[in-house]
Curated annotation (Swiss-Prot):
Residues 58-85 form a coiled coil. The chain crosses the membrane at residues 11-31. Residues 154-184, 201-223 have a biased composition (Polar residues). Keywords: Coiled coil, Membrane, Phosphoprotein, Transmembrane, Transmembrane helix. It is found in: Membrane. The modification Phosphoserine is found at S152, S153. The keyword Transmembrane helix applies. This is Protein SPATA31F3.
Length: 329
């Protein structure tokens, strides 16, 4: 049993057994871990994936914004420095500096970008220069608009004034016509009353005065300012006709009164007119002062008949007239 091969066998056997047990334990532990990982691992990993998926677009966007802002700021700084130093290149010189080959796509793209940047700067400068000019042009545009508004207000005021005057003038014309119409009959009545009450010597000056007053009224009413000439002519014509109508009955009445006074003073005076017609004319003149007796047309047959009748009646008239005169005394 103390032989060396047996000792190695005994040691190797123990090592082999313990090593095999250890290896089996490791395998079991690994299997269990993998089994637990299959159960618990997917939920955690999915949650982490979802979180990464949710966070990545926002992070990318913010990062892109930040980078774009930084790049824009850098370009602005470069352009400011170039402006301050006067290093802004012209459009043709940029392409010459990059590449002599005109068909190079990269150089052409770069020149386009540079032109865009230079164009933006030029626009900014032009806008800053145009702002005061625009404000000045706005002020200039406002000044003529104000003048036009003032002119329009003046025109509207003049139009309203003309309309008001035109609305007033017809009323004044109507009132003048009514006053003249009311004045003409009243004047005629006053003239007739004066003829009835006063003798012949006082009638002539009063009639002339009344006619002068009527003429004064007509002239004052027709010569008003603002009345057209056609209306003034019409008024003058109507007033002349009214005055003629007033003058005609006064002449007839004076002739009748003269004959009546001559009979009263001297009853022996012969007159071809009948006294009844005189009395009738007295009572009729007060009621119808404006009427004028129409002129009788004379025919030879009627004149002969009337002459024969008048020759028969003179004696009767002479007898009747003294009696009436005595009664009046």
């Amino acid at each position: 049993m103390l032989i060396p091969p047996f000792i190695l066998w005994d040691v190797g056997y123990s090592v082999y057994t313990y090593g095999s047990i250890f290896i089996i334990a490791l395998i079991i532990w690994q299997v269990k871990r993998s089994h637990r990982g299959l159960r618990m691992g997917p939920t955690k990993s999915c949650a982490k994936c979802f979180r990464r998926i949710k966070q990545t677009p926002s992070d990318r966007a913010t990062r892109a914004k930040r980078t774009s802002k930084e790049e824009a700021e850098k370009l602005q700084k470069l352009l400011d420095t170039m402006k301050s130093q006067g290093w802004l290149p012209q459009e043709g010189s940029v392409r010459r500096l990059l590449c002599p080959d005109p068909s190079c796509s990269i150089c052409n793209a770069m020149t386009l970008e540079i032109q865009q940047l230079l164009g933006v700067e030029n626009k900014k400068t032009s806008s800053s220069l145009l702002r005061p000019s625009r404000s000045f042009s706005c002020l200039e545009a406002l000044s003529p608009s104000k003048s036009l508004a003032d002119r329009s207000s003046e025109l509207t005021y003049q139009d309203t004034r003309d309309v008001s005057l035109s609305s007033r003038f017809p009323q004044s014309q109507e009132t003048d016509q009514q006053s003249t119409r009311s004045a003409t009959p009243s004047i005629g009545d006053a003239v007739l009353q004066c003829y009835h009450s006063a003798p012949q010597q006082q009638l002539d000056p009063q009639g002339s005065k009344m006619t002068q007053d009527a003429k004064g009224l007509s002239s004052s009413s027709t010569d008003e300012p603002g009345v057209p000439a056609n209306q003034q002519k019409k008024r003058k014509k109507t007033k002349k006709l009214a005055l003629k109508n007033q003058a005609a009955p006064t002449e007839v009445e004076t002739e009748n009164k003269m004959t009546f006074f001559s009979h009263w003073v001297n009853p022996e005076v012969k007159c071809d007119r009948q006294e009844e017609s005189l009395v009738f004319s007295k009572y009729d003149t007060g009621a119808k002062p404006m009427t004028v007796e129409p002129e009788k047309t004379h025919s030879p047959v009627r004149d002969q008949a009337e002459g024969a009748e008048k020759k028969k009646k003179p004696e009767c008239d002479l007898k009747a007239k003294p009696l009436r005169a005595k009664r009046n005394i």
